[in-house]
């Protein structure tokens, strides 16, 4: 079997082979070199078209030959020096100067038209081109470029629901002329979202199908005759689907073996696994030594990976980015101060979430700030589920998406998240105050151990869906954004909120009296679907001093008065 570098060299030469190579000419020569048997030669020679002969020739050569030298010698013998020179040049640069392989050898033979074709065949979704987060897109391109020579890797693109992870990944693949076709021979994009072992099995069954389909399409590729190319792709791809073996009763071991065999023909493929939820998906990809770009809400699944891992966090939109996004979709520029206030209110309520902003824009008919103010009011009184519409985002409301995040949390993390609704949004709150209300189970009366346990619980929530955000300066603090608080306020049981307020009052009073709070608490929490209530005003964004911890509820009196009014309705 050829080594990976030589497999890549054959893939890179594929277009040139289609233009000027007849496998029948090489069979007798390679039989003499003990590469092929008579059976191989008969099978390849009897193929009805040259494209099929090339496809089967390359497939057999990858498996039967131990090096490219015999084929290169044939090209020299057959006076096809352009093929010999290309393969020699590729192997020399790949071995001695890999950093110059792409600009010197590959780039001159690649075109934008081929990139678009590879993106289409790789199932890469077409995304918006009216707005782009250039910083994040360029970081993805840079990381994929840096890691392309690794045998296997994971690049995790992680962030909150609706933050635009899939859009950024798609835009990165579409923007760069270097990634697909130069750094990577091809791409396969698959949507995951599965939460069961069967879902993981189905995902990799689809991956096998995409690899087989990609091989058929590549084997019939002829960029000089586009109509014939399309017809061949359609007919061969349909045949490939019809002849695809059933994997209904195949074990996971057999499926992995089938994928590994298919990867011989696609040795340098980038796999984009979108919306990964389970660590089993990471384990499968690791066993198969895939090169993966992963989009996920839960960055903790990266713990299942041992190869090279890199991380890019997709943060909420900055205020200026929110303006640009809405303007790109046709929202008018604020003309007066009142319009600016309404727009800022929308940005605050959505916490710069692109999906939420898009839903507000799509629901804003007519496109006036008066209508936007009405939508803001609906959000405040009825929660995120009040605005529901069809957008490019896969959920009709952000509430449904966040609810899915909650469902995959452990019972302990879900209970901690429920009591996060007691905290005012947009405020960096020290762990000591969080410890007053977050339920944990410890066997010690040590106050520091309680704080450490609570900090660990809050850290998990910040990693599993960016439901909270942490900061270490000047002390360790955690913050709940407005959009998450707005979601929790209308799904957490009212009695749980009322109990949480009461517990917080009691613990803060004990802090003021220098009493040690009880470290073990098991407070029941329940989520509900709908309710109504008043939203809170914007509060100060400064870290409270330790001597003022007991005054926390007094400092944020307006918020707690509003929350108490909400629970009494």
Swiss-Prot record:
Mg(2+) binds at residue 166. One of its GO terms (molecular function) is cysteine-type endopeptidase activator activity. GO terms for biological process: actin filament depolymerization; apoptotic process; apoptotic process involved in development; defense response to Gram-negative bacterium; embryo development ending in birth or egg hatching; embryonic morphogenesis; muscle cell cellular homeostasis; negative regulation of apoptotic process. GO terms for cellular component: caspase complex; cytosol; membrane; mitochondrion; nucleus; perinuclear region of cytoplasm. ATP binds at residues 131, 162-167, 171. Keywords: Apoptosis, ATP-binding, Cytoplasm, Magnesium, Metal-binding, Mitochondrion, Nucleotide-binding. Residues 1-91 form the CARD domain. It is found in: Mitochondrion; Cytoplasm, Perinuclear region. Residues 116-442 form the NB-ARC domain. It comes from the Eukaryota. Transmembrane segments: none annotated. Associates as an asymmetric homodimer with ced-9. Upon release from ced-9, forms an octamer, known as the apoptosome, and interacts with ced-3; the interaction results in ced-3 autoproteolytic cleavage and activation. The octamer (a tetramer of an asymmetric dimer) also interacts with two processed ced-3 to form a stable holoenzyme. Interacts with sex-determining protein fem-1. May form a complex composed of ced-3, ced-4 and mac-1 or of ced-9, ced-4 and mac-1. Within the complex, interacts with ced-4. Plays a major role in programmed cell death (PCD, apoptosis). egl-1 binds to and directly inhibits the activity of ced-9, releasing the cell death activator ced-4 from a ced-9/ced-4 containing protein complex and allowing ced-4 to induce caspase ced-3 autoproteolytic cleavage and activation. Also forms a holoenzyme with processed ced-3 enhancing ced-3 activity. Component of the egl-1, ced-9, ced-4 and ced-3 apoptotic signaling cascade required for the initiation of programmed cell death in cells fated to die during embryonic and postembryonic development. This is Cell death protein 4. The gene is ced-4.
